[in-house]
Design a protein with these regions (language model features):
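Class I S-adenosyl-L-methionine-dependent methyltransferase catalytic core
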Residues: 1-123
Length: 123
């Protein structure tokens, strides 16, 4: 059986984009070889369309954050704050750098916690 060619989407390999809000169109790089599978655009778009009426001013929790794209999308769309819980040290550092670029110095709407999400929730 012949393998079909992959579909070209026009996006750089290893990145996801913010769909809407103040950071619309900005990209988050995904480390090559990382064990991270970001939530696809279409799924995020549907999720945030459902949440749109209640999202502004809310506090969000992005568990198993990886790239942090869910929490960053929430911030972009008006959430007051997002906490990101990620166990992998490299992914947590990358997420802190992305938040620094997006939210800027002196803004602390995003907080990265390096922890196992289940243990962190258990308290």
């Amino acid at each position: 059986m012949e393998k079909r060619p992959t579909r070209q989407t026009g996006k750089p390999p290893g990145s996801v984009r913010i769909i809407a809000g103040e950071w619309r169109g900005r990209r988050i790089e995904v480390a090559s070889g990382a064990e991270i599978r970001p939530t696809p655009d279409r799924v995020r778009e549907t999720l945030f369309n459902w949440l749109a009426p209640v999202l502004p001013g809310m506090h969000c929790l992005d568990l198993y954050a990886g790239t942090g794209v869910l929490g960053i999308e929430a911030l972009s769309r008006g959430a007051a704050e997002s906490w990101f819980v990620e166990q992998d040290a490299e992914a947590a550092r990358a997420l802190e750098m992305v938040l620094g670029r997006f939210d800027g110095p002196g803004h602390d709407r995003g907080r990265v916690l390096r922890a196992d999400a289940r243990r962190w929730l258990a308290g």
